[in-house]
């Protein structure tokens, strides 16, 4: 345990393994912001899926939405385990995500455009999580 904060678990072991814990917390906070923003965004997109085709898309978007919520909550747990905290200001938190692309399409009921937005969001998540995987590989079996 950390000498400076007895509530933080395993920090010294992670540092001994060569992990920059502060950088990891920073990346986890950014990923939490991305996942939270994506959850909000997918919730909004789902509401615009109307008609026969739209009803079919709702299930796909719901799966992505719930996955993003789960990832957000997982990030939170690990951030606090590592001694980090989230910003108190929700606007600041969302800005950290850098998710300007997460806007409704010009035509908010254009199902193809909605799917393209979903795909872009998921591609971004893969890049973000790969960065964390590379950072923690062989150093942090929990994250």
Spell out what each predicted region is.
Residues 17, 53-63, 101-109:
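Glycine-rich tight-turn/loop motif centered on a GG-T
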